[in-house]
Structures are given as C-alpha cells and as structure tokens.
Amino acid sequence: MKQHFYLLLVFALWALVMTMASCGPKTKGKCGIAASGLAMEFASSVPDVNDALTPETEVHPDSVLKSHIIRQQYLDFVFIALYWSVFFLIIGRSLIQSPARTARILGWLVCVCISVAAIADVLEDVAILIALGGGQSIWPLWFGVPKWTFYFLTMGFSAALFFLRPGSVFRVTPGPGFSLLVSASGVLLMAGSAAGLAGLAMFLLSCKCGGIIGPSSFLTGLPVILLIIQCFRNFRSQPAVRT
C-alpha cells in the first residue's frame, strides 16, 4: 500500500508538471480547440499543424510554440507510464481482486481500456513529433481519437472503485464526510467520462465542442487526491514490523 501512495503522489506531481508545460497562448487550433498541444493531437493535415502552432492573434506559426509542444511530447512519455500504472495496478487490479463479480468485470475493463489508451498515446506522441518535423506519413488524429475514447471509457469504469470500495484500497473505513467525497469522486469520473465522449463525438461529427475534451479529463483530480489520502491512511494503520 505504501508503494501505491508513492505512485499516486508521483503521478499527481507529474500531472502538475504536464499542466504547467501545456500553458501557452491560445491558438487557431481545430474545431474550437485553442490549446496548442491538444490541437496537435487531432491534426490530420499540414494546415491543421500550422493552425495548432499559430497564436490566434498571429498570422504565421510560432517556432517557440513548436519547441514547447516537442518538449510536451517527451514529458508525456513519462506521464503515460504513470497514468497506466495508476489505473492498471491500483484501480483495475483492486477491482479484479474484489469478491464481487461485477467489480471483477469492471476491473478487467479498466485494465484493457487503459492499456489500449496508453499504446495509442505513445503512437500519438510519435506521430506528433513526425508531423512537427515535417513528415506526413502518419497523423496524430489516427491515434488521438482512440486514445481519448478508451481513456474516457477507463474513467467511467474506474468510478466503480469509489462506489463498490473494495477492501484492498478502502481497508480503513472512511468517515461520513470523507465517504461523501469518495462517492462524489465516482460521480465526477462518470461525468467526466460522459462529457469527454460527448465532446469527442461532437468534434468528429460536426467539428464542434472540441474544447470540452481536455477539461473533461481534469475531473480525475479529486479522485486521485482522495486515493492518495486513503492509501496514506492505509499504510499508516499497518502495525510496525518488529525486528
């Protein structure tokens, strides 16, 4: 359980690093996506790449913005390993170890979906680096769509952890106030999943609401914080080993 605590803590800190690295001017983007990094994830042509690199107040692509996006991709390789570990090793495996059949099924779905999302994310980062280098052999859109689809599905299935509360994670029983926050975390994950999938569908079908996709994933924030607290309480409650 101590390992889970440290993994979650590193994941949260790296997510903060990723958020800071993604800060920058709004760009012309694609279908309402103003964040340059996210806009690049859905680029499928040279004009899409140029729009993702062009601030909305400028006419030509910004070379400094291009270097920022390149740096984001290398940071993202670490982030992929971290979020896969959190969802697979902590959330998915905890549900699989539950005696309830429904929890085990949802746990396997979490593990499968986050694995597909992580693989697609790696390929997406590679495609972005190729596109920024002038290559046109593969486009980020081909991998960005499945990545976000399976990531949002993972969020939805992961909500089960906060409703079913398997003993491997919730060994220390939450108090009334904390219990309410745990349930709220499950609701947030389901809401983020639904909003993200809806935004992705609108983006693909009518080139609208692309700006919803990124913020929907931020709803994992409270659940992660609560898991950090819960894992800390769990290992603090363990009796000291006598030597």
Show the residue positions of the predicted features.
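N-terminal membrane topogenic signal
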Residues: 1-9, 178-185
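N-terminal signal-anchor transmembrane alpha helix
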Residues: 2-36
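Interfacial helix-loop-helix junctions of multi-pass membrane proteins
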Residues: 125-141, 207-211
